[in-house]
Amino acid sequence: LFMYYLALCVMPAVAEELLFRGAFQGLMRPSGSAAAIFAPALLFGLLHLDLAQGLTAFVCGVFLGWLAERSGSILPGMLLHLVNNTLAFLTMYLRYYAPTEASFGVELFLLLFFPLFGLWMIWHARGQGFRFSAGLRPGVDVLTVFTSPAYSAVVVFLVVYAVIFVH
């Protein structure tokens, strides 16, 4: 169980945040914060191979990118990514191994606890002086980024990968 947790929760959170918010976002930063946030988020969404998961991953990627821009670190996003993966892991584990009543109770607790905990964290961070604002820097036209050969190559690769391995 521990090895599954490492493989399905910890490693993806660390590796994906290093790649998307660390490397890709860092490479895109000279083009401005908007490109640095949205371009890796789109790739992050495509990586998840499924339309529903991809859209959710894109939105989460935008938030994690914004958080990395505002905080100057990928560690908060890495922690949130780990929490998200852990919640999904626990939900799947409980649905498979726990009685329905117990599974439902734990899922309901997690569904209520983590958003409330997140709101408390935001309130606490604001009390410590952390301000949440867009903070986007001007840069090159975002269209230039999305039509660049390197970006197009990665998008084509992820789409082909999704078509081959999903079907």
List where the protein language model places each region.
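Transmembrane helix-loop-helix hairpins at the membrane interface
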Residues: F2-V166
